Amino acid sequence: MKHLEQRIHALLNADAAATLAGIRRGIEKESLRITTDGTLAQTPHPRALGSALTHPYITTDYSEALLEFITPPSTELHKPIEFLEQLHRYVYSHIGDEVLWVNSMPCMIGKDSDVPVAQYGSSNVGRMKTVYREGLGHRYGRKMQTIAGIHYNFSYPDAFWKLNQQLEGDNAPLQDYISRRYFDLTRNFQRYSWLLVYLFGASPALCASFLAGREHDLLERFDHSLYRPQATSLRMSDLGYQNNAQSSLAISYNNLDEYVSTLTHAINTPEPAYEKMGVKVTDADGNVKYQQLNANILQIENEYYSSIRPKRTIKPGERPTTALQERGVEYIEIRALDLNPFEPVGINQQEIRFLDLFATYCLLRESPQLEKCDLHASKENLRKVVYDGRNTDIQLYNWGKSVSLKNWASEKLTQMQPIAELFDRAHGGNNYAEALAHQQEKVDNPSATPSAQILEQLESRNQGFFQFAMEQALAHRDHFLSGQRCDATNQQLEALAADSLAEQAAGEAADQQSFEEYLADYFHD
């Protein structure tokens, strides 16, 4: 704690606020396309939206029906949400009577085969993306891949890092220092991510169709709905992921080299269950078809599920681990956020401000190496908050001591107050202090959390999860269709759609290698 106070005090004295104004933020938001009767859309990715392979802002995630909206990084606080708004308006003008689902847990889905895998064309890079997704479907089930979320991308400017490095008397090359400090942040994030799940978890219930035929310990209530009375984020649970080969993975976040080597080891280590499944199969017509990229524990880096990732922008054909190793950490991607169904774009400005505070708290707080016992405690804390978090008397593990969620959360938020002061100096006003106070209200009163508000609505209206989610989706559709579209943004998106289709076609025409050769080159060490 002393370490944290000293760092914040030094930053306040050094007038670090000006450097915080250079923070870059970006948002990735996933949404399922659904029909008006609430089932998953079976239509292909609309051509008017451009190529899902090459469009910078509108793409697909696992499924052809799982849209992903991406905002460019910006130093202006309001820009990501404004751009998301415009992307949604544009998409709604090109998807006919389809609707965007606004909950993290999916709509009514029957069989796994009802989930269409995303298609990216005939180029080698496009085929690789589709085969990777086929592999995920065989390994974990397609339904599991339809869960949607918000990813928050965040980076500090070099001026902030240089100031910190100077205050700490560190003489390492700047990029080495930056990478080391981002890993400090990621370790503390794993220790304290339970707090984000409590504050922003918005998936306490789900449609019973999602877990049909699978083991679970949820209660059935309302109309075809499964839930837990005190749950916060079933999206962040291990529901449906029984006997997952990833559960035994120990990816190290202690430093960049260990992270890259443990991740690379998992990508290069065969998994017997996946070997048995086979990489290529021959169909009845004698055609050879890939059903996964390889039979290793992880096909590629992205398969590793984590609530935070250290990232570096990759070059075409480059592996993420190579980019990290050669150029260091550039930004972090926070992946622990549910879609907020009460917000048209799934997130609001106040949440963004708190994420800034939370990430900076994780950076400035002392961050010892994560031992196995620490990882176990972090996972257990997360599990408790996922299933029973709104009982704020539940006991969590804090460095070997037992503490109630309520007391520990309040302590953390109090420790963030001087960080909020720093950010408010950077941006003027007291919006960060207000964002922090709003989170304290949720700790004092669990009924103010999004998860509680969802269950309260199901209870008071005697609705099932599906009816609630559909109502929200239709209300947000009306919001986007009735709002003002920005002509300049609209023209930009129309041009990008055309350019992306041309870029995909050019890539397909330029391919010289066979798919087998392409994969061999890609995975070549």
Curated annotation (Swiss-Prot):
Provide the taxonomic classification: Bacteria, Pseudomonadati, Pseudomonadota, Gammaproteobacteria, Oceanospirillales
Q: What's the name of its gene?
A: gshA
UniProt source species:
Alcanivorax borkumensis (strain ATCC 700651 / DSM 11573 / NCIMB 13689 / SK2)
Quote the pathway field.
Sulfur metabolism; glutathione biosynthesis; glutathione from L-cysteine and L-glutamate: step 1/2
> Which InterPro entries does its entry note?
Gln_synth/guanido_kin_cat_dom, Glu_cys_ligase, Glut_cys_ligase
Name one cellular component (GO) term. Answer: cytosol
Superkingdom of this protein's organism: Bacteria
Official protein name in the record: Glutamate--cysteine ligase
Question: What is this enzyme's class at the first EC digit?
Answer: ligase
Task: Please name the GO terms of the biological process aspect recorded for this protein, alphabetically.
Answer: glutathione biosynthetic process
Catalyses which reaction? Answer: L-cysteine + L-glutamate + ATP = gamma-L-glutamyl-L-cysteine + ADP + phosphate + H(+)
Gene Ontology molecular function terms on file: ATP binding; glutamate-cysteine ligase activity; metal ion binding
Keyword annotations of the record: ATP-binding, Glutathione biosynthesis, Ligase, Nucleotide-binding
EC number(s) stated in the UniProt entry for this protein: 6.3.2.2
Q: Which family does it belong to?
A: Belongs to the glutamate--cysteine ligase type 1 family. Type 1 subfamily.
